[in-house]
């Protein structure tokens, strides 16, 4: 068995144990620091002394002090609006009884994000300095970013066991690639004049890197940090399958018990934390650094001093309040059973929707399954392997030539030669339907809002908001509307994947030169004619890149749909979690199949977009 194989290799076993213990120590230390406990005290005193003095514990950070801290940090980064977002968000999490699981989730993020940052920055710098390294990194990053998250869990369980450390390792593997890409992109964008100025100033290579290049690429690098944080929060539910504590585990337990109200509360907390961290990190990335300000010590650190003072004051008040509370000190933490809740209202709303619209929803579900999805599924499963390979290679040849055709054909042949071809076809059919619907939705919505500058800003802000949602959250509303069917998964995938299609449509239409708009108007074309004959053709290469992103988003959601029951590759990946002997190999292989599907589409679409841009004179 695979576990015995690892047991035989003492050095490898000790290596994985060391990593697990190190990560677990860091996560536990941060949680104890914020939530209180005796483990930090235990480091400095003996167990016997601690047993005799059980009153000696590390005090928890009062939620009141944390709320003030979030308000002050938001004010420092973005003014009163961001301050209110941080303060009200922290207040909501606290009084609704989700303070402890939220801190458990944040401790998870606080440990994984710096590790991802260091790894991503290091590999990004290496790739920037050495073109061969960058060339080698690109296919690896492509596979890592398109492989389903579940595929990583099985080998991580085999190597590192279960617990918070296993969830953090999975998150590090998934969240590091975007940091590498953003670092390389930011360093490449630096103009040669900046590099020459640094060299002319007498900088060594190290000084040039750390005092010129990295500060100049600061915005792109911090955008990478933002992406890393969003990936970490998107993983909190999936990490709960390998033992990670926090809001993700609460959400998973609530869904398993079909407690939609409790699941919605936990999901809303995850979304709220994601929105706050997203806005904070974006404000940090966009904040201009004043290198010439001449401020006193108090002026420079006044908010930090106020925060430190507030922690001291609220901690003293909370400590004194221990004498007034019998069992639970509500100034430290409000337990979930004592906090406010709107779960019963959500449950009542779900019951009302189900009772009122049962026949409509059921009829729509049956129609979609029997008249659309069923025939489409049969058509995919009935198509011969040779015909499928010929079709995909033919499309690739027409768009990109013999090299693209052979590359795409090789990837599809790798899938076809396995015994999972039928499951791959089911995945393809679900992804195809969702991509078509999401692309149409995105193009229509993006085209409507892109007509004015104000509309573009509004819809891009909406896209930013929805992109902060962890993917698992999209499954919550569709489960109670359509039960556990392919319809639920596909609707969640369509909503999730509409965001990139909308964003790229707006970007593409806004990139059309104003002079062409005016030329069309002067030629006497109507508004519809200008949109169909000028704007859409010129924006279509960019729109197709959005469709490319839609494919990746759709595949991720379709695989995630295995949690509520599907028959595709995702179900097999999910099932591999319980197979000790061959589970890791099966999960990685199936995850690679999904990755190859996404990469095949990416190769074809990007090649077409490049050729189309050249033909239109946009490249």
For each of these PLM feature ranges, what is it?
Residues 188, 264-323, 545, 584-619:
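C-terminal transmembrane helix and the adjacent membrane-cytosol boundary/short C-terminal tail
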Residues 65-72, 87-90, 151-155, 215, ...:
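Hydrophobic, membrane-inserted alpha-helices
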Residues 113, 169, 173, 205-238, ...:
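Transmembrane alpha-helices
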Residues 1-64, 334-385:
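Interfacial loop/helix-cap signal at membrane boundaries in integral membrane proteins
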Residues 158, 187, 230-273, 289, ...:
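Glycine-rich helix-loop "coupling/hinge" segments at transmembrane-helix boundaries
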Residues 179-225, 501-549, 573:
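Short cytoplasmic-facing helical segments at TM-TM junctions of multi-pass membrane proteins
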Residues 70-75, 89-103, 112-141, 392-402, ...:
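Transmembrane-helix boundary motif in ABC transporter permease subunits
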Residues 108-111, 115-122, 128, 138-175, ...:
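Generic hydrophobic transmembrane alpha-helix motif, especially the helices
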């Amino acid at each position: 068995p695979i576990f015995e194989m690892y047991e035989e290799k003492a050095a490898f076993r000790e290596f994985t144990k060391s990593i697990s213990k190190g990560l677990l120590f860091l996560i536990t230390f941060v949680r104890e620091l914020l939530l209180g406990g005796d483990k930090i005290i235990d480091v400095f005193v003996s167990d016997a002394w601690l047993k005799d003095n059980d009153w000696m514990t590390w005090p928890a950070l009062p939620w009141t002090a944390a709320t003030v801290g979030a308000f002050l940090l938001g004010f420092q980064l973005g003014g009163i609006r961001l301050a209110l977002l941080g303060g009200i968000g922290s207040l909501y999490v606290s009084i609704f009884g989700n303070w402890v699981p939220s801190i458990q989730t944040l401790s998870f993020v606080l440990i994984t994000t710096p590790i991802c940052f260091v790894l991503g920055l290091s590999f990004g710098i290496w790739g920037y300095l050495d073109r061969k390294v960058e060339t080698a990194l690109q296919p690896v990053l492509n596979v890592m970013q398109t492989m389903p998250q579940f595929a990583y869990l099985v080998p991580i369980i085999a190597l590192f066991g279960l617990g918070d450390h296993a969830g953090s390792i999975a998150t590090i593997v998934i969240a590091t690639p975007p940091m590498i890409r953003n670092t390389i992109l930011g360093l490449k964008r630096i103009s040669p004049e900046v590099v020459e100025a640094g060299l002319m100033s007498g900088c060594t290579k190290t000084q040039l890197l750390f005092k010129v290049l990295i500060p100049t690429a600061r915005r792109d690098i911090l955008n990478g940090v933002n992406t890393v944080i969003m990936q970490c929060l998107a993983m909190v539910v999936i990490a709960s399958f390998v033992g990670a504590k926090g809001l993700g585990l609460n959400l998973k337990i609530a869904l398993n018990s079909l407690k939609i109200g409790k699941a919605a509360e936990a999901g809303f907390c995850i979304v709220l934390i994601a929105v706050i961290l997203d806005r904070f990190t974006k404000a940090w990335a966009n904040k201009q650094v004043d290198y010439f300000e001449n401020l006193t010590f108090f002026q420079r650190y006044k908010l930090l001093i106020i925060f430190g003072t507030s922690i001291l004051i609220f901690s003293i008040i909370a400590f004194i309040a221990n004498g007034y509370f019998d069992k639970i000190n509500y100034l430290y933490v409000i337990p979930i059973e004592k906090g406010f809740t709107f779960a019963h209202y959500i449950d009542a709303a779900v019951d009302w929707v189900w009772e009122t619209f049962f026949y409509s929803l059921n009829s729509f579900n049956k129609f979609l399954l029997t008249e659309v999805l069923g025939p489409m599924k049969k058509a995919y499963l009935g198509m011969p392997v040779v015909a499928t390979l010929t079709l995909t290679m033919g499309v690739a040849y027409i768009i990109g030539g013999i090299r693209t055709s052979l590359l795409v054909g090789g990837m599809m042949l790798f899938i076809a030669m396995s015994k999972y071809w039928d499951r791959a076809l089911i995945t393809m059919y679900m992804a195809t339907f969702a991509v078509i619907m999401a692309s149409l939705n995105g193009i229509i919505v993006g085209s409507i809002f892109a007509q004015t500058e104000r509309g573009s800003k509004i819809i891009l802000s909406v896209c930013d908001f929805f992109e902060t949602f962890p993917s698992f959250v999209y499954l919550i509303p569709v489960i109670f509307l359509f039960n556990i069917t392919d319809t639920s998964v596909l609707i969640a995938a369509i909503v999730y994947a509409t965001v990139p299609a909308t964003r790229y449509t707006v970007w593409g239409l806004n990139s059309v030169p104003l002079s062409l708009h005016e030329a069309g108007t002067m030629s006497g074309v109507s508004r519809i004619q200008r949109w169909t004959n000028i704007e859409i053709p010129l924006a279509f290469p960019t729109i197709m890149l959005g469709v490319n992103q839609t494919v990746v988003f759709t595949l991720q959601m379709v695989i995630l749909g295995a949690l509520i029951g599907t028959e595709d590759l995702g179900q097999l990946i999910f099932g591999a979690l319980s197979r000790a002997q061959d589970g890791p190999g099966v999960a990685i292989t199936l995850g690679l199949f999904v990755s190859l599907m996404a990469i095949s589409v990416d190769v074809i679409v990007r090649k077409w977009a490049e050729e189309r841009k050249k033909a239109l004179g946009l490249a």
